């Protein structure tokens, strides 16, 4: 209850302190609103999506943003891409095709040993969480993993298998822009701050190497005490249905179009002279196709059933869209009010520090902060500040923002850190001490891998 009053009180104090200087009204309002939002996001006296409406109400009210600028923030193409991505993921889950992909990958990598079984589940979890939420991935794989544990006589298998699914779901989400909300927050704020855009394929060129390094390291660490023998029989799957095949075809074409829209070679949007094409448009065309293409079944009225219906589509997490829109709104407020320039000027001395040290510090702070706070709320708060700090230090904002976005997916220590951690911990198959012991090492590994990868891959930006 205290946090309910702490938010507006802290905002008022911040406003009074900052507004004493001439011309500081707009920056003071922006900082006050941001502080209020942050406190309510962290302590959640009201739901996080409801808190996300504060910038929408207060920044235009006090003249920091115009209604048109506010609409542009919430109608940003990346907000629309997130909307389309959520609906596509819903169709994939509704069809059941994701379960078949998971079982296929587990069988392909699982082999005939307990250790390889864990790696198989981790590969499936990481791949699926690139395209659907890590929560859905974990919930889908958990029953299969529990069934495998019932048939295993290896007493050391439970915690590595369940932790592997949770950790891989978080790591895999780094791989694509739609894999986890912090990636989209970065892309939205970066676009707003710099006027440039990061394409789907460009993000993957940076992120996939991190996934490919982190995943085997995590697997080797958590399976160090697991037997190399003792295969487990997995549930048999039936033949693919027509609907599953069609959903997978639509999804595969969509992913291919996302990855090839822009790139070093030009991309199809340039070849076809479509300068206004973006990833959100691709997603919406795919969504429309899912509503049109029949699934091969009939509904209760004898009519052809489609691959997607509105009852399924409307169950997407709408609150995430509000949270994302709030982040872009705050970033726009930072720019319009001049607060971004003020922060950048105050942090100019950062340019004297080694780049690797700055990035590692950001990664360390974000990793451990997201152990106790929402990763999307954390990145939404930090992205405008990091962008201003990078500009003040004379570097490209992406050099500070990308490591933060990736690190927000590397909280492995506590059950409350991510939904996959909570879901697997709730099975009661391992203790919180086990998660902390395994997770703290991977947290530090994540800091090291992301810091080095970003310096090597982004250092010439």
Report the location of each language-model feature.
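Membrane-core helix-loop-helix motifs of multi-pass transport proteins
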Residues: 147, 151-248, 422-454
């Amino acid at each position: 209850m205290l946090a309910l009053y702490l938010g507006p009180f802290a905002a008022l104090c911040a406003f009074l302190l900052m507004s004493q200087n001439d011309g500081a009204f707009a920056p003071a309002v922006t900082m006050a609103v941001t502080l209020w939002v942050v406190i309510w996001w962290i302590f959640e006296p009201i739901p996080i999506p409801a808190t996300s409406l504060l910038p929408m109400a207060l920044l235009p009210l006090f003249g920091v943003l115009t209604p048109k600028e506010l609409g542009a923030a919430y109608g940003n193409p990346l907000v629309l891409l997130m909307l389309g991505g959520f609906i596509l993921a819903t169709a994939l889950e509704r069809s059941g095709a994701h379960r078949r992909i998971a079982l296929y990958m587990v069988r392909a990598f699982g082999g005939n040993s307990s250790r390889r079984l864990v790696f198989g589940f981790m590969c499936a979890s990481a791949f699926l969480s690139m395209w659907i939420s890590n929560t859905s991935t974990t919930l889908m794989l958990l029953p299969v993993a529990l069934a495998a544990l019932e048939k295993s006589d290896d007493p050391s298998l439970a915690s590595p298998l369940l932790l592997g699914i949770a950790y891989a779901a978080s790591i895999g989400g780094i791989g694509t822009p739609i894999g986890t909300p912090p990636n989209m927050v970065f892309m939205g704020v970066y676009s707003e701050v710099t006027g440039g855009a990061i394409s789907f394929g460009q993000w993957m060129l940076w992120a996939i190497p991190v996934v490919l390094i982190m995943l085997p390291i995590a697997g080797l660490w958590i399976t160090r005490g697991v037997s190399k023998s003792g295969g487990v029989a997995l549930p048999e799957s039936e033949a693919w249905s027509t609907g599953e095949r069609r959903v997978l075809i639509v999804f595969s074409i969509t992913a291919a179009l996302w990855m090839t829209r822009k790139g070093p070679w030009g991309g199809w949007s340039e070849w076809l002279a479509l300068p206004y094409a973006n990833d959100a448009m691709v997603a919406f065309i795919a969504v429309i196709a899912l509503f049109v293409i029949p699934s091969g079944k009939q509904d209760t009225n004898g009519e052809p059933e489609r691959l997607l219906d509105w009852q399924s589509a409307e169950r997407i997490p709408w609150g995430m869209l509000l949270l994302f829109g709030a982040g872009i709104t705050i970033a726009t407020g930072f720019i319009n009010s001049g607060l971004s320039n003020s922060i950048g000027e105050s942090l100019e001395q950062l340019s004297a520090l080694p780049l690797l040290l700055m990035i590692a510090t950001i990664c360390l702070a974000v990793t451990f902060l997201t152990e106790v706070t929402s990763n999307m709320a954390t990145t939404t708060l930090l992205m405008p500040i990091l962008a201003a700090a990078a500009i003040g230090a004379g570097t490209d904002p992406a050099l500070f923002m990308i490591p933060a976005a990736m690190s927000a997916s590397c909280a492995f220590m506590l059950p409350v850190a991510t939904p996959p951690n909570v879901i697997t911990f709730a099975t009661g198959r391992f203790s919180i001490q086990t998660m902390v012991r395994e997770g703290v090492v991977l947290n530090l590994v994540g800091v090291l891998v992301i810091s080095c990868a970003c310096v090597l891959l982004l250092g010439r930006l």
